[in-house]
């Protein structure tokens, strides 16, 4: 999720390194392959996707061992309830959790059913109490993402997966680097991925400040 992009950054470093002149990072953690031009005063072109996805962060471990969370990035609360998630501790331990749901008869307001707030949704890892949850290394600030595998549709024409926004962009810049491998360019090219896009385009500010591109192509999807 935003602010915790290290695994995707490591993947991109591996994919970019064989095809570029150097790999650099910006001040926030965005990573970019650089292809230098032999031309003098050549234009600077930045092609950037983003590494982060939306998720949650533990804000409170309750006495009964369940968790309250805050959202990282934009979420529709209607798709959060009664779903499987993975919680990652500081030590990298993966904990299966499930999100609770409010019974329909408790969501009906005077004007009809109301949408639950993220702060009202409890996450449950099956722990007896707060002490047991903490014994597994769980702390406020731990991250939570959907527990979802990529699957091929029955007609084998499409893939269903979480985080297309923006793993697809990461794939595109990786393939662009491969396709341009060994080619001489008439411009300086920086291609890679920003961080913290889902929480306010923060990474884009860092990378554009670092590279000062004359052309910036954002690669994203939704």
What function would you assign to each model-found segment?
Residues 1-222:
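N-terminal hydrophobic/helix-forming segments and targeting peptides
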């Amino acid at each position: 999720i935003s602010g915790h992009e290290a695994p995707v950054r490591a993947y991109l470093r591996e994919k970019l390194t064989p095809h570029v002149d150097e790999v650099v990072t910006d001040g926030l953690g965005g990573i970019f392959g650089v292809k230098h031009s032999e031309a003098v005063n050549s234009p600077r072109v930045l092609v950037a996707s983003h590494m982060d996805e939306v998720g949650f962060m533990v804000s409170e471990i309750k006495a009964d061992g369940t968790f309250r969370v805050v959202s990282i990035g934009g979420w529709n609360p209607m798709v959060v309830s009664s779903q499987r998630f993975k919680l990652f501790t500081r030590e990298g331990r993966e904990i299966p959790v499930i999100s609770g749901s409010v019974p329909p008869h408790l969501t009906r307001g005077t004007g009809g059913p109301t949408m639950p707030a993220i702060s009202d949704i409890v996450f449950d890892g099956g722990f007896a109490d707060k002490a047991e949850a903490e014994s597994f290394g769980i702390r406020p600030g731990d991250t939570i993402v959907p527990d979802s595998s990529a699957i091929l549709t029955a007609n084998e024409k499409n893939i269903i997966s979480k985080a297309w926004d923006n793993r697809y962009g990461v794939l595109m810049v990786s393939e662009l680097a491969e396709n341009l491998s060994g080619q001489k360019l008439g411009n300086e090219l920086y291609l890679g991925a920003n961080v913290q896009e889902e929480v306010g385009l923060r990474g884009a500010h860092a990378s554009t400040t670092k590279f000062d591109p004359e052309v910036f192509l954002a690669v994203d999807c939704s």
